[in-house]
Amino acid sequence: MGWSCIMLFLAATATGVHFQVQLQQPGAELVKPGASVKLSSKASGYTFTSYWMHWVKQRPGRGLEWIGRIDPNSGGTKYNEKFKSKATLTVDKPSSTAYMQLSSLTSEDSAVYYCAR
């Protein structure tokens, strides 16, 4: 039996029109089914701890699904019930970086993932 891979694309968006605000995510990730992956979003141009960071999923031909959000100041999280056992949100304040770990990956997890301020 051969093996397959799951493709995860990463993108970022920031609210408002302030051109210096940036959320940087690396490119695509290719992982095997059953594995875990940790996605990152590095913020710059604003006070990282002043805004919640949201994570959103979009599968081809489907609408956006809100995964959850994290308060970078306190580390407090809120999840969409659907993703509670799939996603874990964390932050690293010194580097102004938000993370989302996705576990037990399946083909259903192949999507574009956005971080959004």
From Swiss-Prot:
Residues 69-85 are annotated as: Complementarity-determining-2. Residues 55-68 are annotated as: Framework-2. Residues 86-117 are annotated as: Framework-3. Gene3D superfamilies: Immunoglobulins. Residues 1-19 form the signal peptide. The keyword ATP-binding does not apply. Keywords: Adaptive immunity, Immunity, Immunoglobulin, Signal. One of its GO terms (biological process) is adaptive immune response. Coiled coil: none annotated. This is Ig heavy chain V region 1-62-3. GO terms for cellular component: extracellular region; immunoglobulin complex. This germline gene belongs to a set of closely related genes that could encode V regions of NPb antibodies. It comes from Mus musculus. PROSITE patterns: IG_LIKE. Residues 20-49 are annotated as: Framework-1. It comes from the Eukaryota. The keyword Signal applies. SMART domains: IGv. Residues 50-54 are annotated as: Complementarity-determining-1.
